[in-house]
Amino acid sequence: MVIPHIICLPMALHLWTCRFLSLGRPATNRRNCRRLRRRAVHRQATRPTRRIHHSAPQSFPQGLFNCAFVLLRRHALCRRLVGISTHVRAFKNCSKSDGPRRHKRTGQNSRVCPCGSWIYRIVSDRSGAFKCARRRVL
C-alpha cells in the first residue's frame, strides 16, 4: 500500500509546481518574449543573450526540480526582454561591463553587460557624459 503513495505524491507535487509557476507568466510577456527573441536573432546583436535561451543545463537533475528551474528561467528571460528598468543602475555599477561597441548591422554605439545580457545604446547628454539608455524593441 505504500508503493502507490511513493509514486503518486512526487507526481502530484510536480504537476502542482508546474501549474503554480506557470500562473506567474502573463500571456503578453510570453508573446513579446517570442517576438523579441525572433528579432534578436535576426539582428545578430545578442551574442551574450543566446546563453540564457537553453532550457536547462545537462548536469541538472531531471524531474520536479528541473521543471521548476526551466519555468523560472523562462519567466526570468521574458521579464528581462520585456523590460525591467531597475537594471540600468546595476549596469552602471557593473565591473564586468566593457566599453562602447559598434553593432554589426545597425552601426549604433552600444554597450553590452555580460552579467545580465542586456544591450544598451550609449546616449550622450549635454554635459558630454555618457549614460545608458535601454533600446526599445516593442
Curated annotation (Swiss-Prot):
Signal peptide: 1-18
Compartment list: Secreted; Host nucleus
Locus of motif RxLR: 34-37
GO cellular component: extracellular region; host cell nucleus
Domain of life: Eukaryota
UniProt keyword annotations, A-Z: Glycoprotein, Host nucleus, Secreted, Signal, Virulence
Major location (coarse): secreted
Glycan attachment sites: 93
Domain writeup: Has the canonical translocation RxLR motif, but lacks the canonical EER motif, which characterizes most oomycete effectors identified so far.
Protein purpose: Secreted effector that completely suppresses the host cell death induced by cell death-inducing proteins.
Protein family (similarity comment): Belongs to the RxLR effector family.
Name used for this protein in its record: Secreted RxLR effector protein 91
Species name: Plasmopara viticola (Downy mildew of grapevine)
Organism ancestry: Eukaryota, Sar, Stramenopiles, Oomycota, Peronosporales
